[in-house]
Regions:
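Periplasmic alpha-helical coiled-coil/stalk elements that build and connect Gram-negative outer-membrane
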Residues: 143, 147-263, 357-360, 364, ...
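A small-residue-enriched
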Residues: 18-36, 68-123, 226-235, 261-327, ...
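Outer-membrane beta-barrel proteins
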Residues: 128, 198, 308-310, 324-326, ...
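Short, charged, amphipathic alpha-helical segments
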Residues: 81, 135, 198-206, 397-405
Length: 436
């Protein structure tokens, strides 16, 4: 009896000592910091509305400022990080032991007293596999959350670029409106002098009104882009006036495709998560196979006539005749195959994302260079000459209007190309998994 009690006690102590390793929210936040260079707000922060140290929403925000605030405060990222607590709870549950079972039969009439203590022995081969599967799932989730942090960085840079683009488009539209207003006034002067017909004056007024309407739309676009930036930063409920710094977009050409793809395969957290998904499914398949046999050690005490209470060991197990856990084993094997195929699909998607982002960046860099060096200078010269000739009465208003329209369209192309470069640069960083 003493040996049996000692055996069961030793099993319980040894099983409870093998604690799992947990990847906490703190370590996941450190992973985001390593990839983005920005910190997640610690759980010890005083209020949820705090900003990163040194940040002030009343000051103009650079793209890096926007990323720092978004990583710190973005509510969806913080909600995603909170889910790691669920995986940690699953890991804790995987390490718990099934409680011993005590059956006691009360002596009634001629029936003797009987006591039966059962302890699940299958813990020796099931618990390590269960813990390993839960640990892999936790690590997989941690890598996925690091990828969410990288996505948040990309979204912040996109939102910042949208605000800069909206502001620049509004500035170009303002110049266009002022120019058309000036031309409209010139036509009125020439009409009074009898140099042109009233029809040209009406056309000039119409163009001036259209330019004013376009300016109003672009100014509303500024407000819409600012609200999107607020949402990404996590300050949608706070109403300070947001301002942004409009710095030139990166002008350097990206690295060769082979180098970017190699770095992406090495650095992408979601690819690492896909690898861990295969390991998780494999561990789970091993765990499901270990559940075929359920074995319990028993300690039985029974009153036997005049001999008093006799105690002795025993075993109890299920006979795997009908149910050998075939369904869950087959499901676990299928999960391994699914995870493997998803891993291959993700590698293909990463290769496409890197190639697409790089090609977009190169395309917009080339387009911006062409417009700036070959399109804008002659248009600016043509507009200046056309306005001078119109004042002298040598050309018609429509000629001036066409020259100005071409210049405004080219200036908008510059603004759009600069914004596209900022977005493509952010997307390429996200596709690679870090700064490239």
């Amino acid at each position: 009896m003493n040996r049996s009690l000692l055996f069961i006690t030793a099993v319980m102590m040894l099983s409870s000592c093998a604690g799992p390793r947990a990847a906490s929210q703190k370590t996941t936040a450190e992973g985001i910091l390593n990839r983005t260079g920005k910190s997640v707000e610690p759980d010890t922060a005083s209020t949820n509305s705090s900003l990163p140290p040194g940040m002030d929403l009343r000051q103009p925000l650079s793209p890096d400022d926007a990323v720092e605030i978004a990583i710190w405060k973005n509510p969806q990222l913080r909600a995603d990080l909170a889910t790691i607590g669920l995986a940690e709870a699953d890991l804790i549950d995987a390490g718990l032991l099934r409680n011993p079972r005590l059956d006691m039969l009360i002596p009634v009439g001629a029936k003797p007293f009987e006591l039966l203590l059962s302890f699940p022995v299958e813990v020796f081969w099931q618990r390590p596999r269960r813990i390993a599967a839960s640990q892999q799932a936790l690590d997989q989730l941690a890598q996925s959350l690091i990828q969410n942090g990288i996505n948040t960085e990309r979204d912040a840079r996109w939102a910042h670029a949208d605000v800069v683009q909206a502001l620049d488009r509004a500035a170009v539209a303002k110049q266009s409106a002022e120019l058309r207003e000036r031309v409209s006034k010139l036509t009125e002067v020439r009409l009074r002098a009898g140099d042109i017909s009233e029809l040209e004056t009406i056309a000039a007024k119409t163009e001036s009104a259209s330019a004013g309407e376009q300016l109003i739309r672009f100014e509303h676009d500024v407000q819409l882009a600012t609200e999107r930036l607020r949402a990404v930063l996590g300050v949608a409920s706070e109403r300070p006036s947001l301002r942004v710094n409009s710095s030139p977009p990166p002008a350097e050409a990206p690295s060769p495709m082979e180098a970017l793809l190699e770095k992406a395969m090495e650095r992408r957290p979601d690819l690492r998560a896909a690898e861990l998904a295969i390991a998780t499914a494999t561990k789970r398949a091993g765990w499901e196979r270990s559940r075929v046999l359920l074995l319990s050690a028993q300690l039985s005490s029974k009153e036997v006539g005049t001999n008093g209470v006799l105690t002795g060991p025993g075993v109890s197990f299920e006979l795997p005749v009908f149910n050998r856990n075939q369904g869950l084993v087959a499901r676990a094997d299928a999960e391994v195959e699914v995870a493997s195929r998803q891993y291959v699909a993700l590698k293909q998607r990463i290769a496409f994302e890197v190639a697409e982002a790089r090609e977009q960046l190169v395309q917009e860099l080339d387009a911006l260079k062409t417009v700036r060096e070959q399109v804008l200078p002659p248009l600016q010269r043509a507009v200046a000459l056309a306005e001078d000739q119109y004042k002298k009465g040598d050309v018609a208003y429509l000629f001036v209007l066409e020259q100005n329209r071409g210049l405004i369209d080219s200036q908008l192309r510059v603004v759009d190309s600069e914004a596209a470069i900022r977005r493509a640069h952010a997307q390429l960083e996200r596709s690679v998994g870090s700064r490239y």
